[in-house]
C-alpha cells in the first residue's frame, strides 16, 4: 500500500510523522520503504508498504499523491488561521480526481493548548472542502516532538510497555492501515 503524507510547504512535521508511521508499520512486522521517490517506482515484492513525504508541492509529489491508497494531510494549528490553504486544497483535490479510490485523512497538530473554537471551525471547513475526506485526529506536537497528555484515554488494548510514539500517532496509524487488535 502506498501512503502519502502532505501539508503546507516547509512543514517538517510531515516528514517526522511519515517516519513514525513507517516505524510503527515495521514494528507490526511489515517491510516498509520510507523515501520520497516516484510512486510505483518500488518493487512490491520487496516492500509491503511505501510511506512518502509528499509535502514539497513538486510534480513528483503530485504523482505520489495521485498514486497513494491513503493520503494524510497534516495541518499545523497556526496554519489554520494564518495561512492560505488554496494550494494545499488544490493539490489534494487533484490527487482525489486522479485517484478517486484514495482515502483522504486530515490531521492537525497543536501544542499543549487545545484548538480554539475558531481553529476548530477552520479545520472543519478545510475538511468539508475535500469530497470524501474525513478528520482523522488531532496530534499533540510540542517542541517538534509528538507526545500526549491524553494517554489515559487510550484503550488498554493499545497500551504496551514498549510504545514507540504518542497515543495519537498510534491512533492515526490504526486509521491509515485499518488495523485493530483482537
PLM regions and their residue ranges:
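Glycine-rich phosphate-binding P-loop
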Residues: 1-23
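Conserved beta-strand segments of the P-loop GTPase G domain that flank and frequently precede/overlap
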Residues: 6, 35, 50-54, 71-77, ...
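Post-Walker A helix-loop "phosphate-sensing" segment adjacent to the P-loop in P-loop NTPases
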Residues: 23-34
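Switch II (G3) loop of P-loop NTPases
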Residues: 35-37, 43-64
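Inter-motif core of Ras-like GTPase G domains
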Residues: 58-79
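Conserved C-terminal guanine-recognition region of P-loop GTPase G domains, centered on the G4
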Residues: 83-113
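Beta-strand-loop-alpha "switch" segments that mediate conformational coupling across diverse proteins
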Residues: 110-158
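NTP-binding/hydrolysis catalytic cores, primarily Walker-type P-loop NTPases
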Residues: 151-182
Amino acid at each position: 500500500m502506498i501512503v502519502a503524507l502532505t501539508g503546507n510547504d516547509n512543514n517538517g512535521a510531515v516528514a517526522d510523522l511519515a517516519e513514525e508511521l513507517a516505524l510503527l508499520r515495521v514494528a507490526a512486522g511489515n517491510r516498509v520503504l520510507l523515501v520520497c521517490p516516484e510512486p510505483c517506482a518500488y518493487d512490491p515484492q520487496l516492500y509491503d508498504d511505501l510511506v512518502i513525504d509528499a509535502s514539497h508541492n513538486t510534480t513528483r509529489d503530485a504523482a505520489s499523491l495521485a498514486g497513494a491508497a491513503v493520503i494524510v494531510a497534516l495541518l499545523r494549528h497556526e496554519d489554520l488561521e494564518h495561512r492560505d490553504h488554496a494550494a494545499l486544497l488544490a493539490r489534494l483535490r487533484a490527487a482525489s480526481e486522479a485517484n478517486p479510490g484514495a482515502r483522504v485523512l486530515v490531521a492537525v497538530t497543536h501544542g499543549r493548548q487545545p484548538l480554539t473554537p475558531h481553529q476548530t471551525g477552520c479545520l472543519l471547513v478545510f475538511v468539508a472542502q475535500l469530497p470524501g475526506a474525513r478528520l482523522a485526529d488531532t496530534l499533540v506536537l510540542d517542541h517538534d516532538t509528538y507526545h500526549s497528555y491524553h494517554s489515559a484515554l487510550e484503550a488498554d488494548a493499545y497500551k504496551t510497555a514498549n510504545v514507540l510514539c504518542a497515543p495519537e500517532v498510534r491512533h492515526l496509524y490504526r486509521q491509515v492501515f485499518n488495523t485493530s487488535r483482537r
